[in-house]
From Swiss-Prot:
Its main location: cytoplasm. Residues 492-495 are annotated as: G4. This is Translation initiation factor IF-2. It comes from Sinorhizobium medicae (strain WSM419). Residues 383-550 form the tr-type G domain. CDD domains: IF2_eIF5B, IF2_mtIF2_II, mtIF2_IVc. Residues 63-77, 184-201 have a biased composition (Low complexity). Residues 78-94 have a biased composition (Pro residues). The gene is infB. Residues 438-441 are annotated as: G3. InterPro entries: EF-G-like_DII, EFTu-like_2, IF2_assoc_dom_bac, IF2_II, IF2_N, P-loop_NTPase, Small_GTP-bd, T_Tr_GTP-bd_dom. Transmembrane segments: none annotated. Residues 528-530 are annotated as: G5. Residues 1-295 are annotated as: Disordered.
Amino acid sequence: MTDNKDDKTISVAGKKTLTLKPSGVTQGTVRQDMGRGRTKAVVVETKRTRSPLKHKDERPITPVAAAPAAARPAEQRPMPPQPSGRPAPQPQPHQPRQEQNRPRGGVVLNDLSASEMEARRHALAAAQIRDAEEAKRRAEEEVRRRREEEERIAREKEEAARRAAEEAARPAVEAEKVEEKVEAATPAVAETRPLSERPAPAATPPAPAGVAPRGRRAGEDEEGERRHSSAGAPRGKVVRPEPAKPAPRAKGDEGRRQGKLTLTAAVDEDGSQRGRSLSAMRRRQEKFKRSQMQETREKISREVILPETITIQELSQRMSERAVDVIKFLMKEGQMMKPGDLIDADLAELIAGEFGHTVKRVSESDVEEGIFNISDADDEMHARPPIVTIMGHVDHGKTSLLDAIRHANVVAGEAGGITQHIGAYQVEQNGQKITFIDTPGHAAFTAMRARGAQATDIAILVVAADDSVMPQTIESINHAKAAGVPIIVAINKIDKPSADPQKVRTELLQHEVFVESMGGEVLDVEVSAKNQTNLDKLLEAILLQSEILDLKANPNRTAEGTVVEAELDRGRGAVATVLVQKGTLTPGQIIVAGDQWGRVRALVNDKGEHVKSAGPSTPVEVLGLSGTPAAGDRFAVVESESRAREISEYRQRLAREKAVARQSGSRGSLEQMMTQLQTSGVKEFPLVIKGDVQGSIEAISGALEKLGTDEVRARIVHSGAGGITESDVSLAEASNAAIIGFNVRANKQARDASERAGIEIRYYNIIYDLVDDVKAAMSGLLSPERRETFLGNAEILEVFNITKVGKVAGCRVTEGKVERGVGVRLVRDNVVIHEGKLKTLKRFKDEVSEVQSGQECGMAFENYEDIRAGDTIECFRVEHVTRTL
């Protein structure tokens, strides 16, 4: 037993005392009132006596619980035993001590017999003896445990001291090894001193809390002594000592913030600070050595490849320099830039030279290198057919002449009987092939004729014998001279009665075309396409000229040539008519034509037959391109799709940049555009043009641009080869434009969309009609012309003031006549002071429509009465006349 209330030790240690249950005694439970509405279950024993009489007031009783030893010390002494016939009942082990100390209440118990009291005293004495033995055993165990703990702590201290000594000596050994490697003596000796030689900071406490050994608190020895001294105290709860608070950290003490906690720092009782690591010491020594020896890093000069534009960040990466250094250099030059800013190649070259690098400048156009103008060896050259272009004025019989040579009828297939496409054909004469290119003669097809002249070897100038030299004839002569190709004059229509070939030769002299009959070198042949007269002579002249030119090409190389025409066919897709000038083109090859590329799916000749190859001077249709190239673009075969795609993307980007530059140059800023509209007042006629081939669209665009004036002009919103689609209608609706289809039609979706949007679609197959209709429509945008016709003058003799009418001028007509309702001007001292309309015109008292010269009349003006005698009235009529382009 003990006085400590906190002692949780149960006096009866879980062992149930063996008791002999007396006969005639029954146990039960009752609810005992605890007060304030609380109850508890109480075990009671009922004793039945053998006497025949029962006590009427007999009630169940409960065993008396053992009171605490501290409350009743007198009961701790054993009482003298009394004889009893049965053993005393033991207290229930499951009842806690608090319940034993609780005062009785609620139920009045009967007095126990002497034997029962004696038995209970014996049980209580035995329990007290067991408690004393248990307390003694626990005290012995506590002393033994403390002794073992002290021994373990002593061993840990010795081990920690040994490790601390090793850690303190290791930096000194390592520093000596590093010092031997350093050639020059350095003042780094102070850094290599062992940690044990460093003076401890004065402000550091001898045993800081942050470095205390694990499992051991400050003042533990004193606590151990205190526990030894109190070993004989009464048994109770072991009071744990509170950990000592860490001493306040002195100013400048880094504590645990410098690095991690190690065993060396934990047992460092002298308070020395944590030392620098070995790698840090090596870095410091190497840095000091370089500074002492003034060692400089070797500059590496690199070859920097510079495109046309480059960012500062990318330039610095190519030079292996820091972008900050490049920006500093630019700041010194007076330019404030960011790493992401673009600079041109000139500035980039200046920067690279400043940093000591060499520069190699490249251009985006380098992707096109090696695909054109590849030189061929002379022994690989073979003779090729001549390429002949037929040129001349419209309706002079160019296509008819070619039809007669080919024995075909192309004129019947052309709308209006005029050629609106470039046609490429190949004929054979005496076993030799000749390639013909037919060009349009209309004025709108100037670009086509120019392309035909550039891609040709010989130009045939067709001149009608009855029409002589015409404007497009002169233009064809100029194209041929600009291309540097020889000319053969074919004087056509000699079968007509009005034909005069000599007149043609004479007029050609004015344009520096000297035929052989006039002492020149130009061949001339009189032919008739209708009657097929002298066609063989013309072909012989062509072959003779080709022999003089000695035309050769290398067929055993990649193909190269010119796009003659391109169109978008519904069933075949993009189709380009090309003229192979060098090499041989075969299906499956990858070609680049303008800004389009593709793999050749099929080759079709001028007769509609599929061919397996196309050699030099052979015209073929190419299927398989990604889009329609522009007529006149050059094509070439490349080795891979990636190369073709790269070239195509580069050319498309160039085309976009040119279009943007053209728009920005013509449009400028918004203020400039508004100023231009206010000053010039130019009206635009928007159009969406779709044609069958690219060349026709180009001709239409050129013809419409020529119609523009200072007041109105045609603006082509979109143009392309192919049929009219729903997207074209949407574009026309957004831009309020009209749609023109040249030899193409709109599909059903486009027609339905145009009906819903109210967009007009006009179809044409002759360029004359298209240009005339657009010209008439553009004329409607012109403001009408104001024409003024002088009628006569009248002199004011007197001014009358009439009621309800106002001032009326009495006049005499001095010149011409005066009409009512016409425009009048009031002239005073030769200065026009008013211009308006004549309201009233009377002769005597009658209203008249006009007054002739020499007669007198009365006049009144509309909304004007400042008239005086002596003023002159000038009458005129204004007419508005519709203007045309």
